Amino acid sequence: MSVCLTEEQKRKIEENRQRALARRAERLAAQQNSQTNRSLSAPLNAQIPSGQQGVLPSAQSINATGTSRAANSKYAFQKSPSGGNTAPSVPGAAGNKVQAVGNRSHDSKSLTDPAKDVKGNYTVPEAQSVPSGPSNAPNPRHLYPAGTTPGQESAKHSNSYSRPEPLTACDNDTTGPGPLRSTTTITKFYGAGPGSKPAVPVSNKTVSEGRERGVTGSAAEAVPAKKASGATRGRCVKHAESRFRVEVGYSAELIALFKTIPSKNYDPATKMWNFGLEDYASLMSEVQQLQSVELKALEGMEGVQIAPPPATGGGTNINALLAMCNNWQRPSATLRGRCILVSRSRFEMEIGYHAEIIGLFKQMNTRNYDTKTRKWSFMLEDYQKLMESVRNIQQVEVEPLPRPVLQAFAPQFGKTTIIREEIPEVDLSQVDSKLGSNLMPFQRDGVNFAVSREGRLLLADDMGLGKTIQAICIAAYYRKEWPLLVVAPSSVRFTWAEAFQRWLPSIRPESVNVIVTGRDSQSASLINIVSFDLLGKMDKQIAATFQVIIIDESHFLKNVKTARCKAAMPLLKSAKRVMLLSGTPAMSRPAELYTQIAAVRPSFFPRFHDFGIRYCDAKQMPWGWDYSGSSNLNELKLLLEESIMIRRLKSEVLSQLPAKQRKMVVVAPEGITAKTKAALAAAAKEMAKGFKSKVQEKEALLLFYNRTAEAKIRSVLEYIMDLLESGREKFLVFAHHKLVLDHICEELGKKDVPYIRIDGNTSSADRQSLCHKFQMSEKSCVAVLSITAANMGLTLSSADLVVFAELFWNPGVLIQAEDRVHRIGQTSSVNIHYLVAKGTADDYLWPMIQEKIKVLGQAGLSEANFSETTESTDYFYKDPKQKTIYDLFQRSFSEEGAETNADEALLLEACEEADLGDAVCSPTDYSGNSCKRRKIDEYFAL
């Protein structure tokens, strides 16, 4: 039964046939080149079989584009009886006829046998005469003079072979037989690989020099490919301000190239691609390497020097390697394999048994066979040689290394080195001295890496290793290119503002613009901080001006279909410097990592499907493709670390870290409702008044404290959810009010996040079982704890993060709570986050806590020092009203004596009652309750 082929299959078959013919002719040409060189010193007499002879045309009969100049010559191509193109016998460069004979009956083996080269099948014509392109080249086996029948031509040359006139020195650079050349005239005729030099019809000297460069295969530069006679032609035209478009016919090869350009944009209305002018040189450089496409330069840019693509260090041209990524599939192959990068210097070839393949492996000098895995590995310097040899085995298909791997490790393919080159030290003299002097050694390494990658990187350090300070330093290094845009979760926007004011004192506070609403985004400052949700509402013209962008918690962009990702990706691809910060780069879920890679290096994987096939173990299901898996993760890790990612774990830099790292997190004020703001304002106003008794003062403080708890609930929940989304699996959350604890547990329950809760109602037996459950849990788990009920007697060292949703006026209680994780058995540095809300009681509690800790430290009673280990401390700014309230806090909680202790105990008892759910009492409730007051007096009288 006949098999119906689709048009696509027919097209591929025809392409494969044309390529096979081109390779065959190239091998013939290489042999004939050696034979021609011999003819310079010795006559050659050979008997030629009759009936299948032909002559290649001279340079003068073919123009630069490969078309016949029939109008200017009596020689013209004719059709042979067998259907092939025929060509005349024409005068050679020295005035004599240059003839070439091809035997149609020779098999491929005999054509490539060097021992038969002396028989001679071709005499090579002048270099400048040759057009390129296998699909449109005349067949050298069917070439006849115009007006001559095949029979006549056969009779004419049936008994002898006319020896050509010796070539001049400028026509050939070497004599005698020798090894196969990397570039020959027939190679140019049929279109060599991407590294070939074009044949330019100029003086003999120029042609000779061009040939010499092609033969030696210089690694210093990549030479443009000779265009085929049927090449697709187009032009570059100015499109808009700082952009140009390409007007050209359809070319699959060109479309694939377009998709790798960072500034690409496709207009479906005109069906044309346009690009930023900054990518003009790189695009034209790549087009030069395509044989099938020719583009006219952009008007006014004709004189721009188009730098050739870089070559690898040992003579291997990167374009030759990249060319192997095209058309490697062989539908008829019986054995399939693939290449996988296993280290910076070696790759494996995974393939089944095949005698010829094993024979090739044993020819490689750097081969290594692992008897356990039964796999062969080789140094990268053998990659090109091995792949070229494997391609000659028709029954075998081997998937090459991906293009990004070839680009990232390009120097290794020329000369492999196991030791990574040391990244040069960056000059930070232009950065604020306060910032540069506070960088730890590993943080300085991160800055060096970023600058070596031209400010485009994924900073994936573990949590608590100072990604914020590194990002600020990198951005400050590129300060001349500001304005700067910082995109962060809404819960940490003001934390970023505080960090800029602390580490860059040269920046005026009014230069930092925190975008809170959509209306705030209509103007840009020097530093602009916006949430992911508000990014899409920014004015597009303003957003386009940002050339330096920081994305905090960049894993928020993992889903390409979300609005936040759609708003961010165009900005990131067009920006000059992009810093993505993420403590959890999702290496086990490569599909979630794709958008971050595309943001930093758009040219790596223009199509997600290609990435998914290689690294997501993509499978085609009845409903579509499934990209949820993972594959080749080690190769992906090596690729990212070599190109865009730097990641350090706490265990690697633990010796440089303090035991505790405190961080003040300023939560967003918009989380406070208008009603709560009014209540806070009323409470603050009440506190600013004078009070007749200290009890009334304490009661006013208690009311203000409770209002603060209500105001912070929304922001606290948002911060906890951000931590969970960031991949934090186990941490502690301390709060004081029952209202706050209830809301946290309720939200965790809605999200199906496992948690434990320990407060004043939890029995001693239950406490121990809950602690054991938390310690042994291997999955995510959050411990929701009361500050006063769970600040001692518990061990929760399996976590290394503590979050204080509320502050407490007694710093000793806070330090005890911190030590629930900072205990024996803790092997990591502990991170402590204090959530502080402006416009609340935190304005006065936070500086008061720091001052108390400082006094204790000076007295030698405390090792903890908030001011030295907290990332942001310059938070409290006093005005007359704030000063009054602050003095009230200080006076209420710092006086000595039994009366003060009684008042503090009264406040603590009231807070504990609030923790159990009692309503907030009015200012007269406690002062009028003589029984309760007597009970407390009796307690202190004991």
Curated annotation (Swiss-Prot):
Can you name one GO molecular function term for this protein?
hydrolase activity
> What's the EC number here?
3.6.4.-
Q: Name one Pfam family in it.
A: SNF2-rel_dom
Q: Where is the composition biased (Basic and acidic residues)?
A: 104-119
Instruction: Summarize where ATP binds, as residue positions.
Output: D461, D462, M463, G464, L465, G466, K467, T468
What InterPro entries does its record include?
A: HARP_dom, Helicase_ATP-bd, Helicase_C-like, P-loop_NTPase, SNF2-like_sf, SNF2/RAD54-like_C, SNF2_N
> What processes does the entry annotate via GO biological process terms?
regulation of transcription by RNA polymerase II
Task: List the catalysed reactions.
Answer: ATP + H2O = ADP + phosphate + H(+)
- Residue limits of the Helicase ATP-binding domain? 448-603
The short sequence motif called DESH box sits at 552-555
Provide the family line: Belongs to the SNF2/RAD54 helicase family. SMARCAL1 subfamily.
Q: What protein name does the entry list?
A: SWI/SNF-related matrix-associated actin-dependent regulator of chromatin subfamily A-like protein 1
Q: Which organism is it from?
A: Xenopus tropicalis (Western clawed frog)
What is this protein's gene name?
A: smarcal1
